[in-house]
Structure formats: C-alpha cells, structure tokens
Amino acid sequence: MEERTIPELLRPSHEKGAFFEHCKVCNRELIEAQNDYCIEKVVKKQGDPPVDNVLFEYAICINCMNNLRNQMSAESQSAIMRYQIRKMAESPWQSEEEVMNSFKDDRCLFSGKHRDDMQQYTLVGYCRGKELQADRPPAMLDHLFLEEIQDLISDETRDELDRFSGDNFGWPPEVARQLKNGDLVFL
C-alpha cells in the first residue's frame, strides 16, 4: 500500500510533525472529523546563501474553497482551467506515475524544474484527515506559473480574491503585499 500520510513539506512549518487541524476560514475541525481540505504553502528563498522561508501557509476546508471558487467569474474559471490543461500537456512528464512523483521528487508540476532552482514556489495538497487524497496528487508550482495565472483572471475575480483574503486571513502587511502579487492559488 502506498504511503499517503501528509508529508512534512505540507505540514505547519512552526511545529515539526504537527498537522493543520482547522480551516483557516471557518475553523472547522479537519483531522478527527476526516473532512476534506486543501493545504497551501508559499515558500521564497531569502538570504545568502538562499534559505527557504515560508511566507504563508494554511488549510482551507473544501466547503470554504468551493464558496470562493463560486465567487470567481466564469471567465476566470474557464481561463484557469484551459491554462492548467495546456501546461500539463506541455509538461515533461510522460506518464501518470511521473506526474504523481513530481512532488516527491521536489519538481514543479508544470515545468519539471527542481525546487533548488526556483526562487519562489507554492505547495498544494488535497487531504482528508492526516492523509493525502489518493486521486489528487500534491503539487509544487514555480511562482512564475502563478504570475501567469494572475494575468488570466478578470478584475472582478482579482477583487474577490483580495476581499476574501482581507476578510478571512488578516495577513501581516508584508504577506498582504505578497498576496496582491497573486500567491493565493485555490487550484
């Protein structure tokens, strides 16, 4: 049987071995209740020599994620879907197994670029309890792709993402500035 326990990369950076226990938006319990949720973590290399620094991380239950998606314009949802399909078709992976292993191998899902070669990247994992969902592999995405996605979304959707972030996360100013540059993914 394949190991599906959430890997350390997708766990809270401030407490080794811990799991995200509650939805950042509604505070719904995630682990014991076996609720479906998504983890997002944005990491940027800083310093000399460069060291990975977590800019922000959170878990959001699927209900809250779907509520946000429903607020996105149909135009933006369609543009993001087309973009993801195109990028997967252009990716270096030749098999489903290679796609599944890209995260484990510290490689960008779309480009195959190694984590060491990315200045900033986002980690995304869909989970239930303490395990990754078997049908949705975790992903590592080079920040360059997220910038491209930001160029695809409508002003209406961008405003909604900004409002959602402000209402639900209360980020420190340095993180809020980063979010304005399009780091909130919700794939």
Model-based region annotation:
Residues 88-187:
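Long, contiguous alpha-helical scaffold regions
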Residues 4-9, 24, 28, 75-79, ...:
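A generic short-segment signal for beta-strand/edge and adjacent turn/coil regions
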Residues 1-12, 39-48, 84-97, 124-125:
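Short Cys/His-rich Zn2+-coordinating modules
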Residues 50-81, 133-162:
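Short metal-binding segments enriched for Cys and/or His
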Residues 27, 35, 53, 63-70, ...:
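Detector for Asparagine
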